[in-house]
From Swiss-Prot:
Gene name for this UniProt entry: dapF
Active site residues according to the UniProt entry: 74 (proton donor), 218 (proton acceptor)
This enzyme's EC code(s): 5.1.1.7
Lineage: Bacteria, Pseudomonadati, Pseudomonadota, Gammaproteobacteria, Alteromonadales
Coiled-coil regions, chain positions: none
Site (Important for dimerization) location in chain: 269
Keyword Acyltransferase: no
Protein name per Swiss-Prot or TrEMBL: Diaminopimelate epimerase
Organism listed in the record: Shewanella sp. (strain ANA-3)
Pathway the protein contributes to: Amino-acid biosynthesis; L-lysine biosynthesis via DAP pathway; DL-2,6-diaminopimelate from LL-2,6-diaminopimelate: step 1/1
Length: 275
């Protein structure tokens, strides 16, 4: 039997598994079955806690989408990861350092129960996002057979394009998201953010995630939106980001500096499952 915990960060929900004290392996097919909301546990991502590869770090953090594919990073998941390892007694630290396939992250448990995550320095060089463009720009034109879109692009360990919208509540997220997530200029696919700027310290955001469709919240998407908004001169250093599942606070001092994201991490239940 495998012990697991169901958690969520703003409704972005996870199956979290301790791979430190348990010997676990999940095939893509098993992950797809477990992710099914009718026949399985149901989740957006599976988070796996593994022992660190580097003695200076506390854990290795792996993320699998509901389609079974492994991805580089998940900000909402990182907050749940921090709360999980602390709740399960895998560490007694308030500041936790982890590696992911995209690099290293620092997670900080706050006194009010929220978790602050150092999301790293955003990548703006198109070749590193990866995104097909001659050079880094504030905005890019994305052409599709139906229409042309203006977007910003950045990577937070995973690729994002961000569109400015007048009214996020009525944005055609499902259709445009599905169209752009597989756009040929993003060789590894892309997460698509729909950003409404309320004022320079406040945005509303919906995100169509690569491999998962629209989710209630996307931490890396919130970071990417703030980066794009700041570069375009629309946003301040600290920004409140309202997502369908709740609110995150993002702090960024500008190019070359890491982003800090603060938000909740909720425990839902503990369970066990036979694979």
């Amino acid at each position: 039997m495998i012990q697991f915990t169901k958690m969520h960060g703003l409704g972005n929900d996870f199956m979290v598994v301790d791979g430190v004290t348990q010997n676990v392996f999940f095939s893509p097919e098993q992950i797809r079955r477990l992710a099914d909301r009718n026949f399985g546990i149901g989740f957006d991502q599976l988070l796996l806690v593994e022992p660190p590869y580097d003695p200076d770090l506390d854990f290795h953090y792996r993320i699998f989408n509901a389609d079974g594919g492994e991805v580089e990073n998940c900000g909402n998941g990182a907050r749940c990861f921090a709360r999980f390892v602390r709740n399960k007694g895998l560490t007694n630290k308030n500041k936790i350092r982890v590696s992911t396939s995209a690099g290293k992250m620092t997670l900080r448990l706050e006194r009010d129960g929220t978790v602050t995550v150092n999301m790293g320095v955003p990548v703006l060089d198109p070749s590193q996002i990866p995104f097909k463009a001659k050079k880094a720009e504030k905005t890019y034109l994305l052409q599709t057979p139906q229409q042309t879109f203006l977007c910003g692009a950045a990577s937070m360990g995973n690729p994002h394009c961000v569109l400015d919208v007048e009214d996020v509540a009525n944005a055609n997220v499902a259709e445009i998201g599905a169209l752009l997530t597989k756009h040929e200029r993003f060789p590894r696919g892309v997460n698509v953010g729909f950003m409404q700027v309320v004022n320079s310290g406040h945005i509303k955001l919906r995100v169509y995630e690569r491999g998962a469709a629209e989710t209630l919240a996307c931490g890396t998407g919130a970071c990417a939106a703030v980066v794009v908004g700041q570069i375009q001169g629309k946003l301040d250093q600290q920004v409140r980001v309202d997502l369908p599942g709740g609110t995150l606070t993002i702090n960024w001092e500008g190019e070359g500096k890491p982003l800090w994201m603060t938000g909740p991490a909720q425990h839902v239940y503990d369970g066990q499952i036979q694979l």
